Regions:
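Conserved N-proximal alpha/beta basic substrate-recognition cap immediately N-terminal to
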Residues: 1-39, 47-49, 55
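Short hydrophobic/aromatic-rich motifs at helix boundaries and adjacent loops
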Residues: 7-11, 43, 130-135
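Short, hinge-like loop/turn segments at secondary-structure boundaries
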Residues: 12-17, 43-44, 67-69, 109
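CheY-like receiver
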Residues: 39-40, 73
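Short secondary-structure boundary/capping segments
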Residues: 40-41, 53, 81-82
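Conserved anion/nucleotide-ligand pocket segment
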Residues: 45-66
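Internal nucleotide-binding/catalytic subdomain
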Residues: 61-182
Length: 182
């Protein structure tokens, strides 16, 4: 089950909701409810974030400014399997504007240790523009992290995540990756 937190965005979102871990507003769509996706997109503000539910080598996220293009891309992802089986289910998510960073937490399922944070550079273009790649690089330490922000991350995200893993008997030992927006 712990692997599903990484392998399925829908499972991860449900986990976050169960443990009151902050996450963007979202809804999941498949070929069975794709007709309802248009109404959800209309109430969202652009840009529209479409995420393949499964693993897609870091390339399964589309950020689209135009409503019609978002509708078309969603259908391409689900019906045409743009990202293979990974996009048979797509999470439409509220766009969060800010700086993306990565948190790595070592855990034995009961205790944890946070490793240094890193600032990701995923985009193919100069100045972090263009499509996502499988990973262009990351820089650590992150200069904009202060003790107040680190405390919020620990109290609102890390502790509830480790608590949830333990409470749901996931028996996980290893690294928990947490992607954040500041």
């Amino acid at each position: 089950l712990a692997g599903q937190l990484e392998g399925s965005k829908e499972v991860a979102k449900q986990f976050m909701e169960r443990y009151n871990i902050p996450t963007a507003k979202h809804e999941t769509f498949t070929k069975d409810n794709i007709d309802q996706s248009d109404a959800f997109l209309v109430i969202m503000n652009p840009p529209y974030v479409l995420k393949a539910d499964g693993l897609a080598a870091g390339k399964g996220v589309l950020i689209i400014d135009n409503l019609q293009n978002a509708k078309d891309e969603l259908r391409s992802m689900i019906l045409d399997k743009k990202f293979g089986d990974s996009s048979s289910k797509v999470v439409i998510e509220e766009f969060l504007d800010g700086i993306e960073l990565s948190c790595f937490v070592l855990t034995d399922g009961n205790n944890y240790k946070t490793l240094p944070f890193a600032k990701d550079y995923k985009k193919i273009g100069e100045g972090d523009t263009g499509l996502n790649t499988g990973g262009m690089g990351a820089i650590s330490p992150v200069h904009f992290l202060d003790n107040k922000f680190l405390g919020k991350i620990e109290d609102r995200i890390i502790k509830p995540t480790i608590h949830g893993i333990k409470k749901e008997n996931m028996e996980y030992m290893g690294v928990v990756f947490i992607g954040l927006i500041k």
